[in-house]
Amino acid sequence: MGRPAPRGSPDSAPPTKGMTGARTAWWVWCVQVATFVVSAVCVTGLLVLASVFRARFPCFYATASSYAGVNSTAEVRGGVAVPLRLDTQSLVGTYVITAVLLLAVAVYAVVGAVTSRYDRALDAGRRLAAARMAMPHATLIAGNVCSWLLQITVLLLAHRISQLAHLVYVLHFACLVYFAAHFCTRGVLSGTYLRQVHGLMELAPTHHRVVGPARAVLTNALLLGVFLCTADAAVSLNTIAAFNFNFSAPGMLICLTVLFAILVVSLLLVVEGVLCHYVRVLVGPHLGAVAATGIVGLACEHYYTNGYYVVETQWPGAQTGVRVALALVAAFALGMAVLRCTRAYLYHRRHHTKFFMRMRDTRHRAHSALKRVRSSMRGSRDGRHRPAPGSPPGIPEYAEDPYAISYGGQLDRYGDSDGEPIYDEVADDQTDVLYAKIQHPRHLPDDDPIYDTVGGYDPEPAEDPVYSTVRRW
């Protein structure tokens, strides 16, 4: 006799070996989500405690960029330079942003676990497949490792073990890059990814909104944090190199700039070449790259200001080259952002996606609102010139026209006041001509015609005079 099937199964067959494996994988996935949530909460709480008990975290919250005790004379003569460090605000800000993003991804994983059960009759295997679309096992493992490595970095800095802390942070950065890339791709091809996401539109709309639009927004935020961490990663690599090799002060600046440029350019090419096929609209990486460029530039300027004489003595003009290189990195990031937005727009317009339709509707609504605002402003300006209620009407504008005709007994341009338009005097036939002559008689002189006063002129009568039709004056 077999054990009865669990409630909600599509058939009453006993559980097979495949169903048992699916249930085990489902519970393993749930445990991974729980551990990821705990690790994200722990790293966030550690940063909060470090901000409260600053005396217990001296190297983490102290002013790390103080180079006052450095012997500049030895450096000028060719001694080993002091490693370049970030200021406290940049270091702590980067760590806090990373912890907040990890916590947001943990919350997203919990929401994905809840929405994965889009049908009550869903078995463990299908629910596990839906949950993996939110976050696979490898992504959860990478997220756990990122959180714990960041906590170890903070604790090592608190105990002033600087070299080991920088090494652990480099490992944390590498794990964070893998975590963000795997979160974006889920470890599948882009065609498979799109088919799986689009297949949930009709089957599970709520879960589709989680693994579709919400995932795209979170991917942008996570990649922004990754590119923001490139500044700390470059400084950590530069510090490790300074501990193992003899660098001068200009060499320290140049090494940091080269490492940072390599990291940013490489990651931007990966975003444009691989990740853009999964999420078309990606603006977070480029914003993070520009912000990281500012962080590195600020650290270089602070280092150059404190060691001005050393840098200018050993390598004059090195800081100018560093500034130009950082400016080129920022310009490259902005250019890639423009390219990404252009390609995303062309893709959505070519395929007529819902995102493009919504953007077009938003643009039309914005234009309509702008037109309404302009018309209301124009109406308010016209209302200022309108007469107040109860005031006598003003003279119309056409009354000043010299060719205007007034009716109703008013004077026209000829001074007539008979109340009829002037064009009524134009006759159409002989009867109207005669009536017009009687109504408006003309006083003609009774004198002789003008031709009689011309001396010596006596016109001879003709049988058919030419001027017989001309009225005699």
From Swiss-Prot:
Q: Which InterPro entries match?
A: Herpes_glycop_M
> Membrane spanning segments where?
33-53, 91-111, 138-158, 164-184, 217-237, 251-271, 281-301, 319-339
Which parts of this chain are annotated as the region Disordered?
A: 371-399, 440-473
| Descriptive protein name | Envelope glycoprotein M
Q: Which GO terms describe its cellular component?
A: host cell endosome membrane; host cell Golgi apparatus; host cell nuclear inner membrane; host cell perinuclear region of cytoplasm; membrane; viral envelope; virion membrane
| Swiss-Prot/TrEMBL keywords | Disulfide bond, Glycoprotein, Host endosome, Host Golgi apparatus, Host membrane, Host nucleus, Membrane, Transmembrane, Transmembrane helix, Viral envelope protein, Virion
Highest taxon of source? Viruses
The main place the protein resides is virion
**Mutating residue 462 to T has which effect?**
In strain: Nonneuroinvasive mutant HF10
Q: Where in the cell is it found?
A: Virion membrane; Host Golgi apparatus, Host trans-Golgi network; Host endosome membrane; Host nucleus inner membrane
- Ranges in the topological domain labelled Intravirion: 1-32, 112-137, 185-216, 272-280, 340-473
> What is the annotated quaternary arrangement, including any partners?
Interacts (via N-terminus) with gN (via N-terminus). The gM-gN heterodimer forms the gCII complex.
Topological domain (Virion surface) residues are: 54-90, 159-163, 238-250, 302-318
Q: Which residues form a coiled coil?
A: none
The membrane-topology field of this record reads:
Multi-pass membrane protein
Report the gene name: gM
Which family does this protein fall into? Answer: Belongs to the herpesviridae glycoprotein M family.
| Protein function | Envelope glycoprotein important for virion assembly and egress. Plays a role in the correct incorporation of gH-gL into virion membrane. Directs the glycoprotein N (gN) to the host trans-Golgi network.
Source species of the chain:
Human herpesvirus 1 (strain 17) (HHV-1)
> What HAMAP family does this protein's entry cite?
HSV_GM
